[in-house]
Curated annotation (Swiss-Prot):
Belongs to the bacterial ribosomal protein bL35 family. Residues 34-46 have a biased composition (Basic and acidic residues). The lineage of its organism: Bacteria, Bacillati, Actinomycetota, Actinomycetes, Mycobacteriales. Pfam families: Ribosomal_L35p. Residues 1-47 are annotated as: Disordered. NCBIfam families: rpmI_bact (TIGR00001). GO terms for molecular function: structural constituent of ribosome. The keyword Ribosomal protein applies. The gene is rpmI. This is Large ribosomal subunit protein bL35. One of its GO terms (biological process) is translation. Keywords: Ribonucleoprotein, Ribosomal protein. One of its GO terms (cellular component) is cytosolic large ribosomal subunit. The keyword Lipid biosynthesis does not apply.
């Protein structure tokens, strides 16, 4: 049986916290920011916790 591999795309997009939660970056803050209000870009700052149902699938991809 070959070694299980981590999904490389998922490993770039998700991170696990110390408590075991999976976090992600918020969308819509990469480019074309000129016309977006500053309040919106601030709101999109930081990380967001992945929803429970999605977290199960993401965990499977990260553990390999």
């Amino acid at each position: 049986m070959p070694k299980a591999k981590t999904h490389s795309g998922a490993s770039k997009r998700f991170r696990t916290t110390g408590s075991g939660k999976i976090v992600r970056q918020k969308a819509n803050r990469r480019h074309l920011l000129e016309h977006k209000p500053t309040s919106r870009t601030r709101r999109l700052d930081g990380r967001a916790v992945v929803a429970e149902n999605d977290a199960k699938r993401v965990k499977k991809m990260l553990t390999g």
